[in-house]
Amino acid sequence: MSEMTPREIVSELDKHIIGQDNAKRSVAIALRNRWRRMQLNEELRHEVTPKNILMIGPTGVGKTEIARRLAKLANAPFIKVEATKFTEVGYVGKEVDSIIRDLTDAAVKMVRVQAIEKNRYRAEELAEERILDVLIPPAKNNWGQTEQQQEPSAARQAFRKKLREGQLDDKEIEIDLAAAPMGVEIMAPPGMEEMTSQLQSMFQNLGGQKQKARKLKIKDAMKLLIEEEAAKLVNPEELKQDAIDAVEQHGIVFIDEIDKICKRGESSGPDVSREGVQRDLLPLVEGCTVSTKHGMVKTDHILFIASGAFQIAKPSDLIPELQGRLPIRVELQALTTSDFERILTEPNASITVQYKALMATEGVNIEFTDSGIKRIAEAAWQVNESTENIGARRLHTVLERLMEEISYDASDLSGQTITIDADYVSKHLDALVADEDLSRFIL
């Protein structure tokens, strides 16, 4: 898992997300506490439970983006789910236990990649030997059995040198590779994904591990052989246990749109996709044991981060038990004009950088001036104020409208430099921004 300090985590998040310092700090502290807990003695470690977080803020201010970036930094099993996709147990739809199953699947995949990477050097050696066996077949005795040579022949060593230098990369060879497992696609109703995956694995194992001769260039064969040999060096049972340990000790679940499962007013009849889901989430967040195809997983030390806009509902509309299990509250602020300006220029891959790169593929050089950036930010903020406030997502709409003409004519503008300043922005957007009806439908 990540050993970054809270300051380093916030610094990394700053490269992609503007503002929202409180949310970044809370998430960074929660992530660091995962590492701190693992440094404790085993007895105390079991007593330290994660402090789950509830992020509250209007749409488009960076809640989901924080989760996306955190997933890359965490180096731990991580899954992001939408609260609206689940229903109460016993009704048609996904049940909340599938969150932990999906998290465990992600952990198995992550641990497998790490194990293969750890065995890569040995796998490369074995793959090299298999290719050399094809190029220079080993000597056989009178009974047709391969003789074990004490020392590699001079010819084999010469070919090994050429292979490592890449001189044989384009030479074609025929080599036996493990045949791809039989592809079986089973469509199952929601909530029965576990049974589907078990049936699929059963059908795939029916064929056994068959070898299939394939004709490939040496550089392509080497890649496939390295993967095959590395997979052989990995113990599946150890891998499953390591994955379950990783989920139990370091797993992070991000639940988005949690405000959409708040109860709205008085309603008769069962509320299976709202309050029912909240009730089902309680044992997961508090700590329970979930059965997965890889084994039993305890959720006591999984960190849960929930987020919601809470424009219609309020955090107090969540059932009290769930509120108590999300003790850390972080409020994200609505974005201002100056935030929009920073969003357009400061992140590593800001929208303006993306548009410049896209147009450069057609030979068109785009220049955004400071006055142009400021005017775009003002236009986006103005439309947000007069219609629905969708935060930074409005910048995509405004910029797409602004760049439409250039994008359409780009192939005819090759070699030209187009400067987008305040006058250019005003000319293309002022009429739309000023007319509230037009901006409501177009921007």
Swiss-Prot record:
Report keywords, A-Z: ATP-binding, Chaperone, Cytoplasm, Nucleotide-binding, Stress response
Concerning Pfam families, the annotation shows: AAA, AAA_2
Where does this polypeptide localize? Answer: Cytoplasm
> What InterPro entries does the record point to?
AAA+_ATPase, ATP-dep_Clp_protease_ClpX, ATPase_AAA_core, Clp_ATPase_C, HslU, P-loop_NTPase
Residues that bind ATP: 18, 60-65, 256, 321, 393
Tell me, what is an example of a GO biological process annotation in this record?
protein unfolding
Cellular component per GO, a single term: HslUV protease complex
An annotated Gene Ontology molecular function: peptidase activity
What Gene3D superfamilies would the database entry show?
Answer: 1.10.8.60, DNA helicase RuvA subunit, C-terminal domain, P-loop containing nucleotide triphosphate hydrolases
Summarize the record's induction comment: By heat shock.
HAMAP family, A to Z: HslU
Family, according to the entry, reads as follows: Belongs to the ClpX chaperone family. HslU subfamily.
Q: Subunit details for this protein? A: A double ring-shaped homohexamer of HslV is capped on each side by a ring-shaped HslU homohexamer. The assembly of the HslU/HslV complex is dependent on binding of ATP.
User: What role is this protein assigned?
Assistant: ATPase subunit of a proteasome-like degradation complex; this subunit has chaperone activity. The binding of ATP and its subsequent hydrolysis by HslU are essential for unfolding of protein substrates subsequently hydrolyzed by HslV. HslU recognizes the N-terminal part of its protein substrates and unfolds these before they are guided to HslV for hydrolysis.
| Name of protein | ATP-dependent protease ATPase subunit HslU
Q: Which organism is it from?
A: Escherichia coli O1:K1 / APEC
Q: Which gene encodes it?
A: hslU
